Amino acid sequence: MPNKDDDNLDMGDSNVSRKGGLLPDIIIKILQILAIGIFTVAIMIIVSYFVSKMVVSQSGAPSDFPVFSNEYLGKPPMLIWYESIDEIRGNTLDVPPKTFVVKLALGYAENNVNILNELGRQKVRLKDIIREYFSQRTGQEIKNESQIKAEIKARINSILRNGEIKEIALTQIDIFDM
């Protein structure tokens, strides 16, 4: 006796059309083409990224920020320089310690006459702030002059009452091995 399942067997009748099968085949083809396109674009992006990195590294271009020209920055303000702070000596935090010798000048606005008297009265405290700053650094840390200027300027301005220092000029920085 034949099973009931035998009635559902496909005998290969070619007259039966399968409309539902055509639409998924088209969608699958479109998805395949999209996947290949996305994969190709991703590979192109990755390759161009690495090629550009190689070109930049071989060109010898510095990776630091560019130095701006004077035309772009404008003229600096006219300052009066207080240069009465003596040479400051001390030891760094290096092991073994190194000796530093520092001399600097403090620039302030030319229209501020009160700050000159205050700088004269605070001279001992200013020397102590500067000596303490350099004594808390290693010889390697002392090499970043722009950071040194900004930090010392902030420390000095925190104690001044009659104005502020606009700029610091490091006229001498020497570090000696002991």
Curated annotation (Swiss-Prot):
Sorted UniProt keywords: Cell membrane, Chemotaxis, Flagellar rotation, Membrane, Transmembrane, Transmembrane helix
Taxonomic superkingdom: Bacteria
Membrane topology type: Single-pass membrane protein
Main localization category: membrane
Entry keyword Membrane: yes
BP GO terms, sorted: bacterial-type flagellum-dependent cell motility; chemotaxis
Cellular compartments annotated: Cell membrane
GO annotation, cellular component aspect: bacterial-type flagellum basal body; plasma membrane
Record has Iron-sulfur as a keyword: no
Transmembrane segments: 26-46
Physiological role: Controls the rotational direction of flagella during chemotaxis.
Protein family membership: Belongs to the FliL family.
Protein name: Flagellar protein FliL
Record organism: Borreliella burgdorferi (strain ATCC 35210 / DSM 4680 / CIP 102532 / B31) (Borrelia burgdorferi)
Lineage, highest ranks first: Bacteria, Pseudomonadati, Spirochaetota, Spirochaetia, Spirochaetales
Originating gene: fliL
